[in-house]
A protein has these predicted regions:
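Structural signature of transmembrane alpha-helix termini at the membrane-water interface
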Residues: 14-24, 78-89, 126, 250, ...
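A structural signal for short, hydrophobic/glycine-enriched beta-strand patches
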Residues: 75, 82-242
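Transmembrane alpha-helices and immediately adjacent membrane-cytoplasm interface residues
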Residues: 48-49, 60-90
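A transmembrane-helix-recognition feature enriched in membrane-embedded lipid enzymes
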Residues: 242-260
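Membrane-embedded alpha-helical segments of integral membrane proteins
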Residues: 1-52, 242
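Lipid-exposed faces of alpha-helical membrane segments in multi-pass integral membrane proteins
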Residues: 7-14, 72-78, 82, 243, ...
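Conserved small/polar residues in nucleotide/adenosyl-binding loops
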Residues: 263-269
Length: 273
């Protein structure tokens, strides 16, 4: 047990260091890996001291408490695995052709430059627009900390520079999170479709780990023809993204923003990563 804790603590610690060196700490979430390292190392030290000095000799946990903690731990693991399985369904989705609209979800902009995650989303959107010339795109994202322009404007400039006609691009520049991305973008589509936006076929373009939540949010808002268009994501950071997305799904479910279902699913041979 002590050896296992040392291994897990080392994995968490080195992954945290890797993230800090490779991508920087633009958010606090990667610190969860540092906390995990401290947690597992702490257990290892405690087990070592207990074995050497008998710190818990003569003490026994009440059976009810022991069994209760075990049941709680198992339930937590089962919930985590179940949510991650749902997230994976979005990662493997193969989008339909000739959708009426695609919604490109915003992500961090550094000044006026797209972050790596956002660039991958916009590149995927550009591919879909090129393959489906009748589709229009709603570029969704407001202006956050460290951003000189809105995320929507940054995406717009990138796609126009790549040759996409401005007539096919609509900007949503007020959202600050994924839920608002979908809500505000659907209002724009509703206006374009004279109040019948929910009848349009819509694709949600985002990094593969984020597709499930984006589509589920759209379904909760009443869209019956909505599906995911997964883009690539950074391979090294994928584990961090998947764990972070677990909390995002749980948060939006608890807030009533989404239902836990995903009915539009196609499984190709390999995921779009």
């Amino acid at each position: 047990m002590k050896t296992l804790c040392i291994i897990l603590g080392s994995l968490c610690t080195f992954y945290f260091i890797g993230i800090a060196v490779y991508a920087g700490l633009s958010s606090l979430f990667p610190c969860i890996w540092a906390a995990g390292g401290v947690f597992f190392y702490g257990i290892a030290v405690f087990l070592h001291l207990n074995r050497k000095h008998g710190m818990l000799s003569g003490f026994a946990f009440p059976a009810v408490l022991k069994h209760g903690l075990l049941v709680l731990a198992v339930l937590c693991v089962l919930v985590f695995v179940a949510v991650e399985a749902l997230i994976f369904t979005g990662m493997f989705h193969k989008p339909s052709k000739d959708l009426d609209y695609i919604i490109v979800l915003g992500a961090q902009v550094n000044g006026t430059k797209l972050s790596n995650s956002l660039r991958l989303r916009v590149e995927r959107a550009g591919e879909y627009l090129e393959e489906n010339p009748e589709a229009c795109a709603v570029l969704s994202g407001g202006k956050g900390t460290g951003e000189d322009i809105t995320e929507a404007e940054a995406m717009y400039r990138y796609l126009v520079k790549k040759g996409v006609s401005p007539d096919r691009l609509l900007k949503e520049e007020h959202s600050t999170n994924t839920s608002e991305n979908l809500k505000f973008s659907l209002k724009i589509i509703d206006t374009e479709e004279d109040g019948k936006g929910k009848e349009a076929s819509i694709g949600v373009v985002t990094n593969n780990f984020h597709v499930y939540r984006g589509v589920a949010l759209g379904k909760k808002l009443g869209c019956s023809h909505i599906e995911g268009i997964p883009s690539k994501s950074n391979t090294f950071l994928q584990v961090n993204y998947l764990v972070r997305e677990f909390f995002g799904v749980v948060k939006d479910k608890a807030a009533g923003n989404m239902s836990v279902s995903y009915t539009h699913l196609t499984l190709p041979t390999t995921p779009y990563v």
